[in-house]
């Protein structure tokens, strides 16, 4: 198994799909990485040489923020919003939708399950 950015990527998949297993790399970014490293998009990870894997690893390290660093940056951004007390930070703190979605009937996932008492069965 090839290890890129601290993630074991699957060997039987195409390189473009395998790169999407890394947090912060989607399909379009994976295509851009392959173009930047001069690697065919359809080649499987098994068929990559060690030199090509090292090229991909270095390209990602130099040009993109992925995995732990990206998670840390996102959490720091959310913490900043909550610290300055803006509306978005307030919504994050309360666990409600941040981007203006309605909450009267929807947003069950974000709000969580309600703690309603369940009626006992009649005997």
Swiss-Prot record:
Disulfide bonds: none annotated. Keywords: Ribonucleoprotein, Ribosomal protein, RNA-binding, rRNA-binding, tRNA-binding. InterPro entries: Rbsml_uS13_C, Ribosomal_uS13, Ribosomal_uS13-like_H2TH, Ribosomal_uS13_bac-type, Ribosomal_uS13_CS. PROSITE patterns: RIBOSOMAL_S13_1 (PS00646), RIBOSOMAL_S13_2 (PS50159). One of its GO terms (biological process) is translation. Transmembrane segments: none annotated. GO terms for molecular function: rRNA binding; structural constituent of ribosome; tRNA binding. Residues 97-123 are annotated as: Disordered. GO terms for cellular component: cytosol; small ribosomal subunit. Located at the top of the head of the 30S subunit, it contacts several helices of the 16S rRNA. In the 70S ribosome it contacts the 23S rRNA (bridge B1a) and protein L5 of the 50S subunit (bridge B1b), connecting the 2 subunits; these bridges are implicated in subunit movement. Contacts the tRNAs in the A and P-sites. Part of the 30S ribosomal subunit. Forms a loose heterodimer with protein S19. Forms two bridges to the 50S subunit in the 70S ribosome. Belongs to the universal ribosomal protein uS13 family. This is Small ribosomal subunit protein uS13. It comes from Ehrlichia chaffeensis (strain ATCC CRL-10679 / Arkansas). The gene is rpsM.
């Amino acid at each position: 198994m090839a290890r890129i950015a601290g993630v074991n990527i699957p060997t039987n998949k195409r390189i473009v799909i395998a790169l999407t297993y890394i947090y912060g790399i989607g399909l379009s970014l994976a295509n851009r990485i392959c173009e930047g490293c001069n690697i065919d998009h359809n080649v499987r990870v098994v068929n990559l040489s060690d030199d090509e894997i090292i090229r991909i690893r270095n390209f990602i390290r130099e040009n993109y923020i992925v995995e732990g660093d990206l998670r840390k940056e996102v959490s720091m951004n959310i913490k900043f919003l909550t610290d300055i007390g803006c509306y978005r930070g307030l919504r994050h703190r309360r666990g409600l939708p941040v981007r203006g979605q309605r909450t009267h009937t929807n947003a069950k996932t974000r709000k969580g399950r309600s703690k309603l008492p369940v009626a006992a069965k009649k005997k």
